């Protein structure tokens, strides 16, 4: 077989059977090889950022890597923002980047670039395959690397390596070694000391077993707990232990951590502010507080379970009760829009949240909704929501996916709607349309750039001129859509979208929070 066939066979034998792709000329042998390996599902995206974001969303729900196929350095560059988010989410991903034929690179053709350097900014593992005979082993190593430490593994494949014969698929990816047991004794001693303690959880600890263990610990010891501001996947809702998220703004996070003498990290990083602000500290750990690392992201749930058995034997974890807000009436606001979502969110839904300022009240409104998963913008690079919803829907076709998306962020990767329509994915996209970059209006004040901004400054934060017609945009990409301005219209549209399989978009008109 040729190199491309060996690559795809090795991927599917290693459990990587979905490939989100935006190919070019140097990847044509990979494209042709798809018909020879029917077990691989290839999905076309119109922009590389959709492919990388979809692979991120897929991994968060499936718990295993997807492949991404990109074209040369510029294609990799186009996908970089959502690769950054995936790196921060600590998800496994195999990125295949096609390159010029080995003998062609010396001619410095127009698309020639330093792919290795670009890949290194987001990848935990990078390798360039130099011969067809090495493709199988290199692909096997990429899969293993992506799963080890949940990271992005990038394999650079020259065109002549793809088309050359003499390649062989690898026998299979070795099983991942079990994590070494964690010594919970020191942290157990801290929690038993009686001094004010806070657990900050992240990684796999924000799913059922980790949440249950952490809730047992808190119940038994009197410690408090928070989860990361932007968790990779937070299981929440009725019947699941409820954890508050660390506040986004530094002032709020500092208030949550005030008085804490011991901060226990279970799969989370030590907290820092997202940006530097004049006169404010970047490190959010209170003065005099000692930081204790219980576990890294990949083994946090197991470490918490062991700690719970040590300090909370027999303790039952409290869980959130079932409750929903009443359906509101009248004009839509951020408050009432959140209540509509909370009142109608289906059981087992996957919520992809990039609602930004418009969604600040969503956590409260959905706290008692039927159990669901909540995916967030881990790396802060906007344009993640629509692509991640694509990947989540591919990973779990039997579950409804609700993408809560802000208008400005949506436009970064709006072509993901086309992929949703092409694959008939069960995704409902809610666009919060306030015609402004509200978060930047807020930050303009917070960074001290001016309490009375002028018209030129405000114009750069206004996206209402011209008004974006998301109904026409969505319909032009094959997604049924409607615009709503009242709570009643929003509720009707949401019910209809949840009742009918396939993609839908609802353009929700809400006022700006800051005028």
UniProtKB/Swiss-Prot annotation:
* Species annotation: Mycobacterium tuberculosis (strain ATCC 25618 / H37Rv)
The entry assigns this protein to a family as follows:
Belongs to the TPP enzyme family.
Q: What induces it?
A: The expression is high during the mid-exponential phase and low during the stationary phase.
Q: Name one GO biological process term.
A: isoleucine biosynthetic process
Q: Which domain of life does the protein's organism represent? A: Bacteria
Q: What is this protein called?
A: Putative acetolactate synthase large subunit IlvX
Q: What is its EC number?
A: 2.2.1.6
Q: What's in the misc comment field?
A: Was identified as a high-confidence drug target.
Q: What does this protein do?
A: Catalyzes the conversion of 2 pyruvate molecules into acetolactate in the first common step of the biosynthetic pathway of the branched-amino acids such as leucine, isoleucine, and valine.
Report the GO molecular function annotations: acetolactate synthase activity; flavin adenine dinucleotide binding; magnesium ion binding; thiamine pyrophosphate binding
CDD domains xrefs: TPP_BFDC, TPP_PYR_POX_like
Q: Does Amino-acid biosynthesis appear among the keywords?
A: yes
Q: In which pathway does it act?
A: Amino-acid biosynthesis; L-isoleucine biosynthesis; L-isoleucine from 2-oxobutanoate: step 1/4; Amino-acid biosynthesis; L-valine biosynthesis; L-valine from pyruvate: step 1/4
Positions contributing to thiamine diphosphate binding = 48
Gene name per UniProt? ilvX
Q: Which InterPro entries match?
A: THDP-binding, Thiamin_PyroP_enz_TPP-bd_dom, TPP_enz, TPP_enzyme_TPP-bd
Q: Which GO terms describe its cellular component?
A: extracellular region; peptidoglycan-based cell wall; plasma membrane
Q: Which NCBIfam families match?
A: PRK07586.1
Cofactors: Mg(2+); thiamine diphosphate
Binding-site list for FAD: 249-269, 283-302
Q: How does it assemble?
A: Heterodimer of large catalytic subunit and small regulatory subunit.
Renumbered to this chain, region (Thiamine pyrophosphate binding) spans 357-436
Alphabetized, the UniProt keywords read: Amino-acid biosynthesis, Branched-chain amino acid biosynthesis, FAD, Flavoprotein, Magnesium, Metal-binding, Thiamine pyrophosphate, Transferase
| Amino-acid biosynthesis keyword on record | yes
